[in-house]
């Protein structure tokens, strides 16, 4: 392993912040004595006060069954520009009052476990609203951080097997904060205050990483703290070559764990091996893997048995948790650094208390209702067997080529009663337009069969790719 130690580096950076009196602290506000007693009780009984269920219930269907007004439906069919303004028009309201809607089965959301409509989670939010309203309005460092937020952080740290966790306003903000804070190490420890090249942080980023990672890395680069190296998507030979040729001591590798537009996994085992060889800091964005992958819902790192090799695990509460917000599971020192230098965390209002309460309930429910994880992977297996398409996750990317083909297929599915979006540039490279299908534990076997039948009428499974051809990768 390389001589450089990230544990020592982050400790030195935190010490510098403390010596300059700019190390920020989180002080949980206790909303009331009753709230404090409830939280202590919840900790004592492991959250046993939360009601859970043994199988799919009728209310689960609200997370996958939706409706759109006829005016919206018509504009959508013809791909007419819309800002949603038609909902305020008299005609649209009249249509709504008459109950004239187009019912659609949702196959494009990220509510993988169907928890957004779970009554236990809804009740947790509702009870918090009734008692506290939205809670104190301010950034977490000022007054927005409560015992609800702290309890949520503790539960997520336990899930991810990390020392601590920092809850952020969104997953996007979490990635931004993490990347900027990592870069700040260079300026904090630079001999002259402005880092020389060999004092900067070298960040190695997968070519298909999420926009929030890309923007965070770009901001850190703009601040003069990092140099960026982009490696070809999941290409460990290319990454190894870049790492071996880089003379900079402080190295970081950042990657999505489960890629949102392709549905493929990062090569976690190979990344772990390279980490042992080069001693880099490994950061993963587990937005689509948290609660979905792993025996306990711990995510992609748990699935591949390499949790100890992940230094920072970024996640979101707006997908499988069915709520809102983001988080960074990490060591206590990294949390101190990020909460002191991560601007998107520092200068954003904390998530409302009802959302923190709901998210904690979601952690409990996801842990206990194991059948939900089993159900979504059963749907993955069924889709694979019925379509013959080689897929490995609940995110199914059916690459059809140009924009016209993708839109035509999406319109056909819309007419057939399915909400499946055509993904186009700039979200994906030109000529790699696709239908992005996502599965949920709230879907049934019959839902999947009906979707496969509709898909078979608008595309040829035998000639449909599930990943981007290498020649379409963004140029380095």
UniProtKB/Swiss-Prot annotation:
Main localization (coarse): cytoplasm
Any one GO MF annotation of this record: 8-amino-7-oxononanoate synthase activity
Binding locations of pyridoxal 5'-phosphate: 171-172, 260, 285-288, 316-319
Protein name in UniProt: 8-amino-7-oxononanoate synthase
UniProt note: phenotype after gene disruption: Light-dependent spontaneous cell death due to the absence of D-biotin. Strong accumulation of hydrogen peroxide H(2)O(2) and constitutive up-regulation of reactive oxygen species- (ROS)-responsive and defense genes. Reduction of both chloroplastic and nuclear biotinylated proteins. Accumulation of conjugated salicylic acid (SA).
Pathway: Cofactor biosynthesis; biotin biosynthesis; 8-amino-7-oxononanoate from pimeloyl-CoA: step 1/1
Catalytic activity: 6-carboxyhexanoyl-[ACP] + L-alanine + H(+) = (8S)-8-amino-7-oxononanoate + holo-[ACP] + CO2
EC number annotated for this UniProt entry: 2.3.1.47
InterPro entries given in the database record: Aminotransferase_I/II_large, AON_synthase_class-II, PyrdxlP-dep_Trfase, PyrdxlP-dep_Trfase_major, PyrdxlP-dep_Trfase_small
Pfam families to which the protein is assigned, alphabetical: Aminotran_1_2 (PF00155)
N6-(pyridoxal phosphate)lysine modifications at: 319
UniProt record similarity statement: Belongs to the class-II pyridoxal-phosphate-dependent aminotransferase family. BioF subfamily.
Binding-site positions, substrate: 24, 210, 427
Localization terms from the record: Cytoplasm, Cytosol; Peroxisome
Domain notes: The C-terminus PTS1 domain (474-476) is required for biotin biosynthesis activity and peroxisomal subcellular localization.
GO biological process, one term: biotin biosynthetic process
Alphabetical keyword list: Biotin biosynthesis, Cytoplasm, Peroxisome, Pyridoxal phosphate, Transferase
Cofactor(s) recorded in Swiss-Prot or TrEMBL: pyridoxal 5'-phosphate
Source organism: Arabidopsis thaliana
Subunit structure and binding partners: Monomer.
Broadest EC class assigned to this enzyme: transferase
GO cellular component annotations of the record: cytosol; peroxisome
Function summary: Catalyzes the decarboxylative condensation of pimeloyl-[acyl-carrier protein] and L-alanine to produce 8-amino-7-oxononanoate (AON), [acyl-carrier protein], and carbon dioxide. Required for the biosynthesis of D-biotin that prevents light-mediated cell death and modulates defense gene expression, probably by avoiding hydrogen peroxide H(2)O(2) accumulation.
Short motif (Peroxisomal targeting signal PTS1): ranges: 474-476
């Amino acid at each position: 392993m390389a001589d450089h130690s990230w544990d020592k580096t982050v400790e030195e950076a935190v010490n510098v912040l403390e010596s300059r009196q700019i190390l920020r602290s989180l002080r949980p506000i206790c909303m009331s004595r009753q709230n404090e007693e409830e939280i202590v009780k919840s900790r004592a009984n492991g959250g046993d006060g939360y009601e859970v269920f043994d199988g799919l219930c009728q209310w689960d269907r609200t997370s996958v069954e939706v409706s759109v007004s006829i005016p919206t439906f018509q504009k959508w069919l013809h791909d007419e520009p819309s800002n949603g303004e038609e909902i305020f028009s008299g005609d649209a309201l009249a249509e709504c009052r008459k109950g004239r809607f187009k019912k659609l089965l949702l196959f494009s959301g990220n509510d993988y476990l169907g928890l957004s409509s779970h009554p236990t989670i809804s009740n947790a939010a509702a009870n918090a609203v009734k008692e506290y309203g939205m809670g104190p309005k301010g950034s977490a460092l000022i007054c927005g951080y409560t015992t609800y937020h702290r309890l949520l952080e503790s539960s997520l740290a336990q899930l991810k097997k990390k020392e601590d966790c920092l809850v952020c306003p969104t997953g996007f903000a979490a990635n931004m904060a993490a990347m900027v804070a990592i870069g700040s190490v260079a300026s904090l420890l630079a001999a002259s205050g402005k880092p020389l090249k060999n004092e900067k942080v070298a960040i190695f980023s997968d070519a298909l990483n999420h926009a929030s990672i890309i923007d965070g890395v770009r901001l850190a680069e703009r601040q003069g703290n990092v140099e960026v190296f982009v490696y070809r998507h999941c290409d460990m030979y290319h990454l190894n070559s870049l790492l071996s040729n880089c003379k900079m001591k402080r190295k970081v590798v950042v990657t999505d764990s489960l890629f949102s537009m392709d549905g493929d996994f990062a090569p976690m085992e190979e990344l772990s091996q390279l980490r042992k060889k080069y001693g880099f800091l490994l950061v993963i964005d587990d937005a689509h893997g948290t609660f979905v992958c792993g025996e306990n819902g711990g995510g992609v790192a748990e699935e591949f048995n390499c949790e100890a090799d992940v230094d920072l695990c970024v996640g979101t509460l707006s997908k499988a948790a069915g709520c809102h917000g983001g988080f960074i599971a990490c060591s206590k020192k990294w949390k101190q650094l990020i909460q002191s230098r991560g601007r998107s965390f520092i200068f954003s209002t904390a998530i409302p208390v009802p959302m923190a309460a709901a998210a904690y309930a979601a952690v409990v429910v996801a842990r206990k209702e194991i059948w939900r994880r089993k159900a979504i992977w059963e749907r993955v297996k069924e889709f694979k067997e019925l379509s013959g398409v080689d897929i490995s996750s609940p995110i199914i990317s059916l690459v059809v080529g140009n924009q016209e083909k993708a839109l035509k297929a999406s319109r056909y599915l819309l007419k057939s009663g399915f909400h499946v979006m055509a993904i186009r540039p700039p979200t994906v490279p030109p000529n790699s337009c696709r239908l992005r299908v996502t599965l949920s534990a709230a879907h049934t076997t019959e839902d999947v069969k009906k979707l496969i039948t509709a898909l078979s009428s608008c595309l040829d499974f035998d000639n449909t790719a599930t990943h981007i051809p290498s020649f379409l990768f963004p140029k380095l």
